[in-house]
Amino acid sequence: DHGRAGLLGLFGGNSGPAHAAPKVTPTALPELPANAFSRIDDGDDSLFFAPPRLVTHIDAGAIAALSDFYRSIVRKGGAVLDLMSSWVSHLPEDLPLAEVIGHGMNAQELAANPRLTRWFVQDLNRDPRLPLPDGGCDAALCCVSVQYLQKPVEVFGDVRRLLCPGAPFVVSFSNRTFPTKSVAVWRSLDL
């Protein structure tokens, strides 16, 4: 199997730029065990992700399906945050966008992505707050990387802050992963 993909979630943005993201505490997911977001390799993510990996993590069929979905949900001419991006965004080439802001862990990969109009490197496991203004994004995407987040509730809450009212946040996932960097709860799933 070469990267089955699925859609994890989709939710609308905040109720307005003045709406603050909800306060998140470690008990925000009390139904999960305390070690749910631990990893086999808790070493520095910037070192692990330093070598550029110019590969796709889902197969051609999954890429086509994801691109078609993006075409149906991302507003033409909008500003998009491509969270945890790489050298390819899977956004349809024929979808005109005002801006695609890339976030990732590898500067070489992000610089190679032709869809990104600007990008930044940040370890969300160290700092889940994104350096972007409230309500400035018409969509946010997180493609096949959610399994690496140790603070997903905090990151998702901050993405909510960035979204315009009603803007979608599309989280896609695959059965392919770097297992030592994936969180325990993800490794326990039968994907």
Model feature map: region roles:
Residues P168-L191:
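Conserved class I S-adenosyl-L-methionine
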Residues A21-K76:
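Class I SAM-dependent methyltransferase Rossmann-like catalytic core
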